[in-house]
Amino acid sequence: PDSGLIEEFIEDYPYSPFPQMQYTERPDRFCAGLSEGLVGIIVDGSPMALLAPGNLASFFQSPEDYYERFPYGGPLRALRYVAGVIALVFPALYVAISLFHQEMLPTKLALAIAGSHVPVPFPVLVEALLMEVALELIRESSVRLPDPVGQTMGFVGALLLGDAAVSAGLVSPIMVIVVAVTGLASFTIPHYPTGLAIRLLRFLLLFSSAWLGLFGLMAGLMAIALHLGALTSFGVPYLEPLMKPRPSLRDVVWRSPVFTFNKRPEYPEPLDQVRQKKFIRTWAPGVAEMARKESGEGGGGDGEDGEDRGKSGDGAR
């Protein structure tokens, strides 16, 4: 049996489009999850391992965030969240504005969009569906081919298909740009099942936007938010790291420096909350003297660490 079969048997909400467990084939990510207090599941004969419980924030994290310095890893992770919103909302937002809310656009942009739709015989919704389905076909066909051929086939096929569709007057150039940006944004999501969920919900938002405009789009987003708020993974709320202001938030949307990760995340409820001691740069000018003064006045840093270690020891006992 594969780990995906085990996941369907033990997850809390099997009918939800959102995954509730992390799955990975990278040893570094698996070991990092174990060190944070997560439970790892390895199936004999399967290259994929499971980590539980899962939450929405963990699906936007990549091991490369920690291998780069935090001035680079932090913005890249924040960019992934922005790309996830674009991949979910951008086509539906374009359809809603084009059909119902043209007054929101500048005059020149509104005239350009209206002029690009003149030779197209289909409504905006049909245009978006045609391009989205074509993009999904190219993506699935490239996955089934060998890696070098599949990547080349994906890029070349998308370029040729978009150019041919515009030349034939089946879609507008602006729609090709919207779908292309959406496809690029969806590729930035590191967790594949989360990307699949966003791709599925994008079609639902397209229909709601074509029906009620921005009101339909907001209703769809509110339904998704309510669903995410009701989800749990082994009893842990799906939005747990984002619901409460905790110290672990420094590693959710933005990756802070590694030397500030003194505590483990709270939601797995690990027995030992202390991940590492408070880091002091004793070799830096003036820092060693300041640390000695603090320790002489009452051992602020050591006392705090000792208290944390005592609490963690009591929890373990």
What are these regions (language model features)?
Residues 1-127, 233-252, 257-260, 270-281, ...:
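Cytosolic regulatory modules rich in charged/polar residues
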Residues 43-45, 124, 147-149, 170, ...:
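Active-site proximal loops enriched in glycine and acidic residues that flank catalytic Cys/His/Asp
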Residues 55-205:
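Transmembrane alpha-helical segments that form the functional core of multipass membrane systems
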Residues 147, 159, 166, 210, ...:
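Generic detector of intrinsically disordered, low-complexity, polar/charged segments
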Residues 175, 180-298:
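Hydrophobic alpha-helical transmembrane segments of membrane transport and translocation systems
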